[in-house]
Regions:
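Short, amphipathic alpha-helical "lid/cap" segments that border enzyme active or binding sites
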Residues: 54-62, 143, 157-162
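Residues that form generic nucleotide/phosphate-binding pockets
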Residues: 113, 149, 163
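Short amphipathic alpha-helical segments at helix boundaries and their inter-helical linkers
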Residues: 132-133, 137-144
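Amphipathic terminal alpha-helices
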Residues: 153-169
């Protein structure tokens, strides 16, 4: 089994990633790829997604678990605005003071790359399907779930990348 850590691997994520690697567990982490190559590889150079900060996800989970009135409801979480992968990398480039580029891969090549990294073929195909969904615009929406359940706005991509910039250096 391979663990996918797509976002920054900051203090907590970095510790989790390192423990998995130390235990010999295959990990595909976005931050190490960016750190090593200054590129992010994917299919979805178009299409936008409102990325969620993991802390917002955790805050919502705590709120839902503590409030039986929210149980059994559908809670779709998003960040506050939609970005494309190239736009997210522009923000990261500004944080790092050097350019991080988006490298477009073909679907077969990306599946093969993920399998080589240790993903089961079915999971690799699922991740590529997710990229297609982004390109098709299926994730181009934002929700108010974080605000509704926590009483505050969701964290922005700029905040997340600023706070985790050292993971990409």
């Amino acid at each position: 089994m391979t663990t996918a850590i797509i976002g920054a691997t900051g203090r907590i994520g970095g510790a989790v990633t390192q423990r998995l690697l130390d235990a010999g567990h295959p990990v595909l982490a976005g931050a190490p790829e960016i750190k090593k190559t200054r590129t992010w590889t994917g299919l979805a150079d178009s299409g936008r997604v409102a990325l969620s900060d993991t802390r917002d996800v955790a805050d919502v989970i705590v709120r839902v678990l503590g409030d039986p009135a929210t149980w059994g409801q559908h809670h779709e979480l998003t960040g506050p605005r939609q970005v494309s992968w190239p736009e997210a990398l522009e923000v990261l480039s500004a944080e790092l003071g050097e350019t991080v580029t988006f490298r477009t891969a073909d679907a077969f090549g990306l599946v093969q790359r993920l399998v080589k990294a240790g993903f089961p073929a079915g999971m690799a195909e699922l991740l590529v399907t997710r990229e297609w969904a982004i390109m098709a615009g299926e994730n181009e929406r934002t929700t108010t779930t974080v605000r509704d359940l926590t009483g505050r706005e969701p964290r922005t991509i700029e905040e997340f990348l600023h706070e985790n910039r050292d993971s990409f250096r």
